[in-house]
Structures are given as structure tokens and as C-alpha cells.
Amino acid sequence: MSNFRLILETEGGKRVLCESIVLHFAFMFQTEIVPVCNDEFTLSSCVPTLDFDVDVLSAAYGDGLEISSPGLRCCIAWPPMYALTLGEFYHFHTHRWVSAYDWSSLLDTDEFLSAIGYAHPIYRDPNPDYDPYVMHSSTGKTIAVDTVTEKVYIIAESLVQFFNIGLRQFPPFAEAELDPEQEKMWFGETKCGREEFILLQRNLPAMKDYVAKHCGKRIRVDAFQDFDFSFCSLSDIYYLTGPGILEKITEKDYAIIGTCARSQAEPNCRAAIVMGSNCHIYIYVENRISKVSKSLRTFIRRGFDELLYKEKYSLDWNDDTLFYISDTETENLNRMLNGELPVLRSKPRHMCVRKDRLVKDRSKILFAVRLDEEDSLTVKFITKFLTPVFVGRLPATSRFVVPVSCARLTNGLQGTAAARFGIKGLHPSSDCVVWNRLIDYEYETYKYPSTYVRADQIADMVKNLKFMDNFDEKWQCITKLAFIGLYAGASLFNFASKPTLGYWCRYLCEYASMLLFQFESKLKELTKESTRQLGGYNLCHWGQELKDCLENKSDVFFRYDFFERIESCLIEHFMLLCGCVECRRMFIMYNKRGRKCDFGHCVRIQCFPMIGSIRLPAFLHLGEPYSVSLSSLIAKDLGLSMIEGQIEHSRLPISLQISVTPDKKALLTFLTNIVFIVFVVNTLYRVINAELDIYYDLFTEEVGKLCVTMEEEMKLGRNGCLGDLCYFSSMKQMKEIVRCPGEKSQFILKCWEALRIGFSVPAYKDYDETRFMEMFFLHHLHIKRFHEHNDRDLVSSDNLIPGFFIVNTHEENFLQRLQRVVLPVAEDYLTNTRCINGTMAFFFSGLKYFGSGNHRGVQISPEKDVRAIGYKLGSLDVLRDDYKYYEYAPDCAGELNGHDGDE
């Protein structure tokens, strides 16, 4: 086995091929140099039964890192029905050398390549001039050569990664023309065949026109991750994070073609996707435009993979407008697409009243309907309130136009609590409030419970709900019960969701357990002198108490007597290990008056007013500024943002300012933090129980009303109830719920059972929502407003709902999602000892600290605000012949009469 090579030894000892010398000799002697292969092997036509892995490759190599067992065929992870046939280039009788690619700019100067083989469909032999050839470098990277264009790509960072992903990172496959069956096999349900937008992907003006006509159309993006892409244009967007961004995008000849995010993302939390004049695809994030794909088809098939994997490795990735991103920026992009990257603002944009032309001058708005949708019942539902106008009689200047289409109107219903959550009968102003509160929990818009409306405010909202005048008052209890059941389930019983109290209770219980274990190790690390000062009895007693506490973790952190015990232990340890004037005074005060002594400041937690004023623990050696800062953070959100911020930076939440030996300081710091975390857990538990009482009282009150109403309907025989066996059975179930509402810790299950019965009541199920929908559409399309901005929920919903018109957000029912994840509000669940969150437990088991005791600054993890896009439903536009235009006329036949609006 040999082939013609000319090798020189470089100073670094690397063996390289001098291609220029080889070509010179070939020219001199006019001799064709061809590879010579003395090894004959027969390619197998059968389907390979062996999967490619590192061991298979190692066994195929002989001396000198050359394939000594050519012809072995293995399956690879992707594409489907592809195999890898091992062998050197010369085994396949091709005029190439592996060493010729050592000069690639993808490799460092001291890297060299070794052969692996050709990747090809399993039903045929490799085609040396068509199929990609795979190699690996001396540093572990896996390289693929496109034998058609001779371009080289890095497709994996290691052989193990190549084993797991196959040729997913091979760019030519993302642009391949595939038949529908093969397209589905390779890339799932993405639409990249002969669809119109794929045919227009190299025609920017035509693409703009397509996007304008198909605004809101949603397609799946990326066969390997859960993304979706929704078409929308620049005229559909009100703002992108910072001011002036939209103008800069248009000045640079970029066009917004849509938004993208992982599924289950709110429309306003999506990333803007931009097409450049070169028809490449870019993403706008963090005030920068970065290229993610060379075509729309590649983007839909591979999503953001090229950007995240750093396509700069590719030799043909040349573009002056490309911004390479760092590892940190890549991580930020991942976090943004997952809805985790906070956008820091003094006030969220969706809470600000818009200065929009739609609001300023509604009398000059035109409503545009495509001619092919003019006869649609959905469109007629709105145009009956409008008067058609003739385009020829209008001035030639641009007018402010609001598109009206079936897709928009259908999507827009998801901006109501009636359509999205099944909560019927509310007046649109109250519907907006309920929808706004529930949508925050459905999309987990924020991460701290303190940001959400708590139970006492929900109780006030329930009492003040406004209903439509044609909705029977006696069935209002079903609507209220639905709101209570959904909000209580999302805020109290869903421990898997970060915004809930139960999640943070679990999180801090795991943290406290870890700190107790660490404290036990700190006791063992004390010097003999420190141990003598502490006293053997105290040390042994606390060690045994530690074991008892950890064995009974299911309730110990919630007991106030346990908190007082460790607080007194903290004071004793400071007295024994420090003994300064401050420590002695605190020790004497505690021994004289015990728990009656006011050791710390009292604060009222702003977000949890129902528990009243609480006493802070007796912390020592914090320093006045640090102590004041800590008190303000506790008053703001119970210190949750500070705790998470410190943990993210591998620091303990509290650090001490004390002059003692390092072993003593470490012990006292850990004990101080244990006291603080147990205090927070104890307070959270009080809040949970207080909210549980509020929701339980609301539930029993409304379910009692529902039972009485159903019984009255049965006696009076209304709506066919008298002879309806299903209704009679439902009424019996409702009576049983009233008689036995169940334990308070899991009343939500009974609440949802009552809700199921309530939703099936004929009078509620068949309620005519026509008037409600009319008011909703007329308001948000700016035809006839039923309220102006006067409440934070109304402002927020007015700003958020346009995104639901434009982006199709038909998702799984929120109640069904909650039913799969709720847990009882019981101590063993709250401490993560039952139905364990393994990820959380694993995180704290490996948590390390680095110099946490020396950091006096406090790191705050900011509240999440990822609503980066604001949408609008109209813009300045030139009038077109393929649209029919309408305007609002107060005296038109379809004018609303008698609606209980407050315009």
C-alpha cells in the first residue's frame, strides 16, 4: 500500500506535502501523477449493522494513522439512511490526498489531518466526486470536504460529537434540493420544498411583498430544536428594544421578514429576523445584527445553529456585513431565545402609554381587506361597522392603513381571556385585566413571585370584575371560579415554574440543606484553639442536632422554633468565637429577654403585605451600610434577587466584617447564612399559607354559589335541566364538592373539578359572545374604543395584544398544562423530599464558593424583562389596487347600540 508523496521535515517536525514541487515535477516530465492503491477491497451493498464510534475508527487504523482496513461501512447519526465507508482517498481511486487539506485556514499551523471515509446513502456505493469526505484533525476536530466545490467545513469539535450529530453541521446539506418525503425524513415538518417563499428567497422586493401578504403565517424552524418562525414586516412593529433601531435597519437596506423564538414564547418576547440586500438572514439582538444563515431555506432547516456553532469556520463564509460573536454573546443569544435574558430598563416598554397615530387620529384610518377575503364571514364580522371607500377618490399620498384579514382576526381572539382560557361573560375592560394577569404566568414572563400580583390583590380583582349586561348574574360564579382556579394553580401549586412560591421554597430548602452540610465540615476544620473556645459540649450537641435536622428536613425549616434555636446558636457562637462588645451585648440581651427582645429591625415586605411586619434576624458584624442594604432588599422581594445573584457569582448571600482567624470567620459566615436562608424559607412558608387561606375562602364561597344556582335551575326546569341526567349527575358532584371540599393543601383539584362542571352548564357553555367579540375587535382595531388608558393592566394589554393578532399563538390549553404539573402544598413537597426536582438537587450538591467571605458588594440578579418587540396593527402605506378599503362611519348600519362601554 503506497501512494506518490513528496515529504519535507519542517522545523517543528511536521510532515507536510509540498504541492508546488509536485506540480513542478509533473510539468517537467509531462507525467500524470495518480494515486496508486495496491489494496483491493469490495464494497458491500448490504445495509450496515454497525454504528460509527471511536472504537470502530481506532480498530480500522494501522501504523501511521492510515486506514488499514478499508471498506468497513457504518451507520451515522444524521442524515437518515446514510452510511460512512472507511478508507483513504486512494482506496476510492480519486485524485486527492488527505495531506493536501493540511493547508486549510481552518487548521492551526501544528495540526494535521487523518482520513475517515466517505459519507453516502446506504443504498449505493460512495461517489468520490459527489459525496462528502470526512477527516479528523490531530486536535480532535472533525472535518468534511464538499467534493463538488472543494470547500472544507468543521462539522464537529470531537469524534464523539460527530458520533452524536453526524453531518448536521455540513452546510451543503442545508441547501440541498430534496423531494417531500426525503425533506420530511431529514428536517421534519419544516417547509423548504417548492413553497413560494423559498422560490423568492433570492428576490428581496418580492420577499417583502410576500411577507406583507402572509403576515402571521407560522412555520416550524430547525429540525433539531423546537423553534418557530412567524412572518411579519417592518410596518407591523412599533419598536425593537431601543429607540431608532427600526430607522437604522431600513437605512442599511435590511428588511424585517419575521420573528422567531422557541415554541411557547410570547409574541413580544421573540427575536427579529432580518434579510439583507444580499438575501442572507440575520438576527437582531442586543442592538446588533448578526448573520445566522446564507439563505432563508438554510435558516428554516437549521435555525440559529450556524451562528451558535460559529460558521466562521467555513472557508466560504465571506461577508463584509458579518459580525462574529463571542462565546458570551452566543450564550446571551441562547438565553434570549429561551426567554431568560433580561432587558434592563427603568420601566418595561409594555407598561408605557404609546404615542401612536392609531390613537391620535382615528378618523383618518383606512381599513384594508384583500379582494380574495372580502366575502369571508370573519372579515364581514368587522366590515359591517365600516363604510367602503373608492380608492380613486382618495388623495395619492400615503394613508394610515390597518389590514383586516381572517388570519389576524382569528389570531387576535387569543388576546382575550374568553378564547384563551375559557373565562366567559366579562366586560372587555375586565377581560383585559384577567388576560394580562394569566398570560404572565402562562409564559412565565418574570422569575420572582414578588413581581406578580399576590392573592390579596386577586381577591379584590374578583370582587370588582365587570360583566357584560347580557350575561346572567347568577353564572358569574363560574367565571370567578375559573380565574381563581387558574391563577391559584399557576402561582401556588406549580412547583416546576420559577415564578411560583413553591419553586423558591424548594430552591431555598435545598440551599439550606447544602449549607448545613457545609457547616458541619467547617466545624471539623476548626483549629484546636477555636475548638477549645467553642467548647466541646456545644460542638457535640450542635453536631447531633444537625443530623436530627437533616433527617427530618420535611418540616424542620418551616418551624419557627427551629429558626429561633439556630438564631440563638448564632449569638452564642459569636460570643464564644469573637466576644467583642457588640457580641456580648447581644448575648446578654438575648439571655435576659429571649424572644421578646427586639434583636433586629422590623420590615414590611412590599409584595406580601398579608403577613404584616416581620422581625429580621439578629445579624452581627454586617456594618451599617451593608445592614441597611440587606433590609431594603428583604423589604423589596424577601431578598430572592440578592440570593440568586450571589449564588450565580459563587458567593454566599451574606458576608461578615469581622477580625478573627479565617477558620472562625468561615464558620460564623456559614452559620449567619444558614440563619438568613432559614428565615427566608420560614417567611415564604407563612406567605404560602396566608395565600392558601385566601384562595381557599374564595373557592368555597364561589363553589357554594354555583351549587345553589345549579339546584335552583334544576327545580325551575330551566334550559332543559329538569330531565337532563347529565345535569343531574353534575349537580350531585357539585353538592359533594361543597360538602367535602378536601384538604386545603390540595383544594385546587376540587376547584378544577368544579370548574369542569361549571364549563358544562348549558347556560354558560352556550353563552353568545358576539357582542363581546365586537367590542374587542372594534377597540383593538381602533374603530371604536371602549376605554382609554387609565389602568396599568389596560395599558399593558393594549400594548401586548397586537402581537397576538400578528403571531399565531394557538397553544395547548393552559389548564391542561397545569393539571400535569401541580403538586399539593405540603411540607414534604415544599422541601423537595417528595416528587424531587433532581436538577435542583444536583445543582446544589455541586455548588462551590470562591472567596465569598471577602466580597462586600451585593450582586443582584435582575428581574427578567424579555419583551423586546412591540407590535402595531397599522402603518403608513400606499393604497393598492388588490385591496378594498373601508373607513369608520358613526352612522353605518352595523353601529353598536347600547353597549356598556365607557368611552
Curated annotation (Swiss-Prot):
Any coiled-coil regions, as ranges: none
Residue ranges crossing the lipid bilayer per the database entry: 665-685
Recorded superkingdom: Viruses
Keyword Disulfide bond: no
Record membrane topology: Single-pass membrane protein
Predominant cellular place of this UniProt entry's protein: host cell
Location of this chain's protein in the cell: Host membrane
Cellular component per GO, a single term: membrane
InterPro entries (alphabetical): UL27-like_protein_herpesevirus
Keyword annotations of the record: Host membrane, Membrane, Transmembrane, Transmembrane helix
Pfam families: Herpes_U5 (PF05999)
Family indicated by similarity: Belongs to the herpesviridae US22 family.
Name of the protein: Protein U7
Organism of provenance: Human herpesvirus 6B (strain Z29)
